[in-house]
From Swiss-Prot:
The protein, known as: Exodeoxyribonuclease 7 small subunit
PANTHER family (UniProt xref): EXODEOXYRIBONUCLEASE 7 SMALL SUBUNIT
Gene: xseB
Superkingdom, natural source: Bacteria
Keyword Nuclease in record: yes
Positions of transmembrane segments: none
Pfam families according to UniProt: Exonuc_VII_S
Location relative to the cell: Cytoplasm
Reported function: Bidirectionally degrades single-stranded DNA into large acid-insoluble oligonucleotides, which are then degraded further into small acid-soluble oligonucleotides.
E.C. number: 3.1.11.6
A GO cellular component entry from the record: cytosol
UniProt cross-references to SUPFAM superfamilies, sorted A to Z: XseB-like
Enzyme class: hydrolase
UniProt keyword terms in alphabetical order: Cytoplasm, Exonuclease, Hydrolase, Nuclease
């Protein structure tokens, strides 16, 4: 059985991180709350990064099956 943490969708985590960023950018947060929100945001960010890395590896495996395609890396593409 999946834990509650595992059931949170990527999009939900991204939306939560965006809300945290908005709160912190507003400047209307007490220092202690800002630190707590920042820590929460960092944890969410790591989860998102892990999910994206796993998705990238899956795509690399899929694309790698076709001899006409080559492996790619997120570091190679600047956004």
């Amino acid at each position: 059985m999946a834990t509650k943490k595992e059931e949170v969708k990527f999009e939900d985590n991204l939306a939560e991180l965006e809300n945290i960023v908005r709160k912190l950018e507003s400047g209307d947060v007490a220092l202690e709350d800002a630190i707590a929100e920042f820590q929460k945001g960092m944890k969410i960010s790591e989860t998102l990064k892990k999910t994206l890395n796993e998705a990238e590896q899956t795509l690399v495996k899929i694309v790698g099956k076709d001899d006409n395609e080559s492996e790619f890396s997120a570091e190679q593409k600047e956004y």
